[in-house]
């Protein structure tokens, strides 16, 4: 079974770069406090790194 990480949105996407908003949508995050569980892959890690100032990651 693949490793998973929990990603929680901690800051609003209002006023952010369109690319960063699209990244949040790609991760499946919709609102502040929303948490999703995703596979720990290089692609997901790259998306998390791009919006690291808006999300919290738990291993």
UniProtKB/Swiss-Prot annotation:
One Gene Ontology biological process: translation
Keywords: Ribonucleoprotein, Ribosomal protein
Pfam (any one): Ribosomal_L30
Disulfide bond entries: none
InterPro entries with a match to the protein in the record: Ribo_uL30_ferredoxin-like_sf, Ribosomal_uL30_bac-type, Ribosomal_uL30_CS, Ribosomal_uL30_ferredoxin-like
Alphabetical list of Gene3D superfamilies matching this protein: Ribosomal protein L30, ferredoxin-like fold domain
GO CC annotations on file: cytosolic large ribosomal subunit
UniProt keyword Ribosomal protein present: yes
GO molecular function, one term: structural constituent of ribosome
Presence of the UniProt keyword Ribonucleoprotein in the record: yes
Self-association and partners: Part of the 50S ribosomal subunit.
HAMAP family named in the record: Ribosomal_uL30_B (MF_01371_B)
Family per similarity comment: Belongs to the universal ribosomal protein uL30 family.
Protein name: Large ribosomal subunit protein uL30
Species of provenance: Sodalis glossinidius (strain morsitans)
